[in-house]
């Protein structure tokens, strides 16, 4: 869980901006999108191999 400490004279907007940046760096949103729907293990393997193939031929 990402958390920040808001400074004494810090505005709410800047604290929110820091929190969003920290969440993005931690990969929270990408993890949520990845886990939004269940994916069968066979589908995961297929996607992984297709991604590897794309990287190889790029």
Swiss-Prot record:
One of its GO terms (cellular component) is ribonucleoprotein complex. InterPro entries: Ribosomal_bS21 (IPR001911), Ribosomal_bS21_CS (IPR018278), Ribosomal_bS21_sf (IPR038380). Keywords: Ribonucleoprotein, Ribosomal protein. One of its GO terms (molecular function) is structural constituent of ribosome. GO terms for biological process: translation. It comes from the Bacteria. Pfam families: Ribosomal_S21. Residues 34-58 are annotated as: Disordered. Residues 43-58 have a biased composition (Basic residues). Belongs to the bacterial ribosomal protein bS21 family. PANTHER family: MITOCHONDRIAL 28S RIBOSOMAL PROTEIN S21, SMALL RIBOSOMAL SUBUNIT PROTEIN BS21. This is Small ribosomal subunit protein bS21. It comes from Clostridium acetobutylicum (strain ATCC 824 / DSM 792 / JCM 1419 / IAM 19013 / LMG 5710 / NBRC 13948 / NRRL B-527 / VKM B-1787 / 2291 / W). The gene is rpsU.
């Amino acid at each position: 869980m990402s958390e920040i400490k808001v400074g004494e004279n810090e505005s709410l907007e800047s604290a929110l901006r820091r929190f969003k940046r920290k969440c993005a760096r931690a990969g929270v949103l990408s993890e949520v999108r990845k886990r939004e729907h269940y994916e069968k293990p066979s589908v995961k393997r297929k996607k992984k191999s297709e991604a590897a193939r794309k990287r190889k031929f790029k």
